[in-house]
């Protein structure tokens, strides 16, 4: 082996660069995961807020005057009344997606998957809002949100008593 080659084989030039690359990639990945996790938790709070907004809208809309909803029956979550409640849930979710498509249900029990339609006076109106959230941070979306296209299903639930009017509309 010639003298210049022996010098290159025993040299330490570039060691700092290699050490930097070894330390940088895990730290940068960790930073990206923290950013994605912060965005995911912010979206989770927005979905929970959308559930509260939908519950507040439901206790106002369900016992409201039938003439405002095309003659739909009072205290029934269907037709125009349901559309207005879904619209109320969609407004806060528009900060997450350009055109959000929330799934709004009225479960009978907390965390339930049924969809109640008829409510009586003083019944508890429970609203559940489900929204698919698209994780967008490169590399971190597969780690934080899973490998399924970077989508995470977020769920918010809120309930309020139905304190509808004790009189009839004429």
What name fits each language-model region?
Residues 2-90:
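Alpha-helical assembly-interface signal, strongest on the long, hydrophobic N-terminal helix that forms
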Residues 2-3, 57-170:
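Short, conserved structural patches
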